[in-house]
């Protein structure tokens, strides 16, 4: 099939930095994103044109052309709505198709002529069309801000708005698309296969970045499997994305596992069952099981069926076994030994499972080349396992992931666009990468931003939750996520989460070390120059410490200026205060992120999204960053003492008296030494605060839930009462209907000669009726006797040793209670109550009711 040329997107992003309306700034993004959908639709039309040559009748031919024309009209309408233009006139294409449809030609005899016209239309469409997305750029406010910062901080160059769009918003979708196509083609897919795989990924809610991230770990076997079937393609993308989003290092291992299973000759269905099992274990947090399935399925080769191995581990985990990873290693060693020693691994496992004594286990350990501890572990765990049980014959988990991703992608995309637009509008994007580096390389600023946006955008659903990560985000103009796809009870009232009091966070205006202009240092009456040098050395050590810990250098701009003006003591005091504020910053940020994490966690828990949705991935990003503060804190606590001696030497060199210098250094050092404990106290306080807040919210939830249960009880009671009232109301009608029916029946059958019916002339019908009954009874007497004898035997055999019914039968009875069954028991040693219980039990077993 001829392929369409690369899309050409002209212009760049519109970033009005003084514009707080996020949606306005996102209009340009909508144009750029929409062109990919147009491209996909055009490709679909080209493919339909290509398939016209396969039609078998003129009716089918014309019907297909009508369908293509309708799709072109939809493309034309969408393009017009989004202000996207084409070099090629779509109306001309429609006209040519109409002409082709109305031409009277015989499908059977004019195939070549039809094919020639189709190829002409297809070629024109694919070669000539270019999409233009015209986006205007307002640089006024940006240039103004750039000039202001340049003058204030003596910075010669600030990132240009175009580079901001490239560095943070990402390369345009067209370039990403082409890059992804190149990767897929290099790994063996045809152009059609590559295009199809990308389209499937986009349809199922994955971005081009997510598709690319999964493809990076995909080898030839994986891509070949994905290209063979649309369902497999979607499932593989889901598995890879889940591994990457959850922070799992398993995407590469999944690819290698698929490759190994393919080499073993496993069918596609068997391979996808294994992938499904692997993903399910990852989702449930069974890390050891998931890793073992990925890794040892490759090393075992054909010594033990991978599905059997996976089933053993999954069953052991489900039964509550501990250290399943050690079980996996022991079985892997057993499988590896089988190659050298020549035994069957599955038979060995069955033999180990059936062994009952320690002596035999010790002998089996030698027989199979394992340690005694390994053989015991295998034996103990196999007691909880059915070796004949395989994996579930489905891929339900993968299909569930695909469904959830499609539903939730729209919500996350909205949040992502809103926060990106807000960050762009407030000038934070140009140093987002540096902020990430400053936080120990764990930044991933987008994940933080998305997490914070979730905390803000879900305000209406969860009460007063505000993110302080980038100051106060105005919710008035944020486009809240559409939750219409999530089914909620009509009257659901979610209890509000109590507001957590968090310290304000003051972000530095600039994250780059400003260039300080040369200033003539005034003469200072000091004993010698080396004192000033040492003072610089001490302060420099502190500055470098702050830089290593957080990556923020702007906090020292003012102290350096004061130093250059000769105000040494003022600089030291300013630096001390600045570093105290700076050291407290990650704690405050930690509290903010923890609050957002709780909110997001409650959101995820409410809708049971487990660990595999886009929202869950955003929460994981927050937790990852929060964990980084532990390492930052460790760095701080281990590096404070560096400054004390250096500063003392500096004071002495500056001419201060020894006692004064020592006291000043000790006072300053004391402040420095107290900071780690202050940070620790803040962390502890923040943990207690979170716990208390969660307890309060949980109690509120319990109270709310109890109320809902009580409402349900009342509803059920009302329902039953309504049913009862309805029966009472209709009872008289039922009585009349029965009476009428009885009257009709009486007309046909009563104790005298019937009035109507076939017996109305026969006065002896009753005699004949009784004769028939008597004859039937006599006829069935032998069968009745057999039944009684059989019952007697069963009752006799059921007697305990100290109680025996010596004779059971039907005899004469003095009772005149018609309809009763009389059983005479001779030789009974039980009382009347005990005997009745025994007989009732026997009759119940024989299904007498």
Swiss-Prot record:
GO cellular component, one term: plasma membrane
Subcellular location: Cell membrane
Alphabetically ordered keywords of this record: Cell membrane, Membrane, Transmembrane, Transmembrane helix
Major location (coarse): membrane
Topology in the lipid bilayer: Multi-pass membrane protein
Domain of life: Archaea
Regions crossing the membrane: 587-607, 620-640
Protein name: Uncharacterized protein MJ0343
Organism of this sequence: Methanocaldococcus jannaschii (strain ATCC 43067 / DSM 2661 / JAL-1 / JCM 10045 / NBRC 100440) (Methanococcus jannaschii)
